[in-house]
């Protein structure tokens, strides 16, 4: 398989994660393009040198870092058009559409540290170890952020402002 074909096999997963991070199709496509450009410009790292052992984790790390850099840098305001067009072939029911809108809104309320981990584990089906490598954080941090993120999502989806706190019994 050629190098460009290897990278192209990852585009759907990168795009899905980028869309969840960025919140709209245009920014997600820009993020995927920047990720692929970075990967191609550093092809010697993953092509044969062995420096990159897990291409998937490395690509998601690159995307994560580019996304964080993009958040830090002020952007010019852009007008997004036609972002509400569904990408699925079968139209969802009204209830499904509302559930997705509610979930997206709840995800947007999560701190970015929790949101990224929830998306990588739930949407991209990454293991805790892979997320740890991708985000360059300890696996315990992955587990605690995931737990807090899931609980916060649950609370938001149930209409509660705050997650239920367990009482400490002495």
Predicted regions and their residues:
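Helix-turn-helix DNA-binding motif, specifically the short coil turn and the N-cap/start of the second
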Residues: 24, 127, 136-141
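A short pre-motif secondary-structure segment
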Residues: 117-121
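A short, charge-rich alpha-helical start-of-domain segment used by transcription regulators
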Residues: 1-16, 26-29, 40, 44
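Internal acidic/polar
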Residues: 77-104, 127, 167-169
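Arg/Lys-rich amphipathic alpha helix in sigma70-family domain 2
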Residues: 45, 60-82, 96, 155
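Short, small-hydrophobic-rich alpha-helical interface motif
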Residues: 14, 28-39, 62, 131, ...
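Σ70-family region 2.3-2.4 aromatic/basic alpha-helix that recognizes the −10 promoter
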Residues: 36-40, 51-73, 146, 150
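C-terminal edge and immediately downstream basic/flexible tail or linker adjoining helix-turn-helix-like DNA-binding
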Residues: 2, 133-136, 151-170
């Amino acid at each position: 398989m050629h190098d460009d074909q290897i990278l192209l096999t990852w585009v759907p997963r990168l795009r899905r994660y980028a869309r969840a991070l960025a919140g709209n199709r245009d920014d997600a496509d820009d993020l995927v393009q920047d990720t692929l450009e970075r990967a191609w410009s550093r092809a010697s790292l993953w092509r044969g040198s062995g420096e990159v052992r897990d291409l998937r984790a490395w690509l998601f790390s690159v995307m994560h870092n580019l996304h964080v850099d993009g958040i830090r840098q002020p952007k010019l305001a852009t007008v997004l058009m036609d972002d509400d067009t569904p990408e699925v072939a079968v139209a969802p029911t009204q209830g499904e559409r509302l559930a997705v809108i509610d979930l997206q809104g709840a995800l947007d309320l999560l701190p970015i540290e929790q949101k990224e981990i929830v998306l990588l584990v739930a949407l991209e089906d990454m293991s805790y170890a892979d997320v740890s490598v991708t985000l360059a954080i300890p696996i315990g941090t992955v587990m605690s952020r995931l737990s807090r993120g899931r609980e916060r999502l649950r609370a938001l989806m149930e209409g509660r402002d705050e997650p239920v706190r367990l009482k400490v019994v002495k």
